[in-house]
UniProtKB/Swiss-Prot annotation:
GO annotation, cellular component aspect: nucleolus; preribosome, large subunit precursor; protein folding chaperone complex
Record text on subunit structure and interactions: Component of the 66S pre-ribosomal particle.
Stretches with biased composition (Basic residues): 7-16, 168-183
Name of the protein described by the UniProt record: 60S ribosomal subunit assembly/export protein LOC1
Family: Belongs to the LOC1 family.
InterPro entries: Loc1
Species this protein is from: Eremothecium gossypii (strain ATCC 10895 / CBS 109.51 / FGSC 9923 / NRRL Y-1056) (Yeast)
Length: 199
């Protein structure tokens, strides 16, 4: 007959045993089925940048400033014509500009606006929010002045046309009156009555 186990021996036996942790997913049949159908996640093709690369990029940013990402345009935005398309009658297809718009040499408003906007696109200079806001405000002001000038030119053109129409109308009116007077004079002349004599 085997002797009785001491408490320390019992404790040592339970402690030495390796503990097994099994996930509930594998014990539950429904969860196990769902796990079998789950798609296997692939590793991303783009590798994560190393610390060295990150430091290098940060140094470049400190020296030269952040580079603006070039905008990529879709085919719809570029208005590229689609080939072999049926021509719909009566529908005008949008085309590009037919000619260049030249700016007058002494048109300072437009020239200043163009200089400011072109510089904005091509210069990769980092500026404070206040400076940028100030520059954008200047561009907006120039655009506003340009619009006002265009409206003024439009109004002047319209006024000239109105004056021309009024002149034409007044000339036509005077002609009508003159013709009416002439007709009245002709009516006032007494008609010679015809006399018939019998022999």
């Amino acid at each position: 007959m085997a002797g009785k186990q001491t408490k320390t021996a019992k404790r040592a036996k339970t402690q030495n045993r390796t503990r097994e942790v099994t996930s509930e997913v594998f014990q539950d049949s429904q969860a196990r089925n769902q796990l079998a159908n789950a798609p296997k996640v692939e590793k991303p093709s783009a590798r994560k940048a190393t610390k060295r690369q990150v430091k290098k990029e940060q140094a470049v940013v400190r020296l030269y400033g952040t580079r603006k990402k070039e905008k990529t345009y879709s085919e719809k935005e570029l208005n590229i014509p689609t080939l072999n398309r049926a021509i719909v009658p009566g529908v005008k297809i949008k085309t590009g500009k037919k000619g260049k718009k030249f700016v007058d040499d002494h048109d300072l408003l437009t020239l200043n606006r163009l200089i400011k906007t072109i510089g904005d696109k091509n210069d990769e200079v980092t500026e404070s929010k206040l400076e940028k806001a100030k520059r954008l405000e200047e561009i907006r002001e120039l655009k506003k002045q340009e619009l006002e000038r265009k409206e003024q030119a439009k109004k002047e053109k319209l006024d000239d046309k109105m004056d021309e129409l009024k002149r034409k109308a007044s000339v036509a009116r005077t002609l009508r009156r003159k013709n009416k007077r002439h007709e009245k004079k002709l009516e006032d002349v007494p008609k010679s009555s015809k006399k018939v004599s019998f022999a």
